[in-house]
Amino acid sequence: VTRVFPEFSNLRVYAGGGGSVPFAPGAPAGPMRFVDLLTHMSGLTYGLQNRTNIDAVYREHNFDFARRHLDSDAFVAKLAALPLEFQPGTRWNYSVATDVLGIAVERISGQRLGDYFAEHIFGPLGMVDTAFGTTEANHAR
């Protein structure tokens, strides 16, 4: 994934710390692959899981809903600055990997995700009422 996300070139795995204690620099993470993102085996997490110190930092930064207040580049940069919960490809954990995959589509295509889906998926399938949100004109429906 580092060709699309150079920010992920120097990821590290959690080794301790959190809360009032700084994170201990962990081992360098192995390469994260797109299949790891697709199968929730990337080492990323969700804050809502409330299990680990990494989850707590995700909650602190509101990562579960970060796309409402961070642009794609800022979101990826903040994720890249945090340690992973585990080495990519070694464990399974629901995570913001789906958000990262959406950003990959944006970076590769040069389009916003909703525009890409409308042009390449929804439009060709005749799904004219399908989108990531509603327009003001459709609120009354």
In which residue ranges do the predicted regions lie?
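Short, surface-exposed loop or secondary-structure junction motifs
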Residues: 3-141
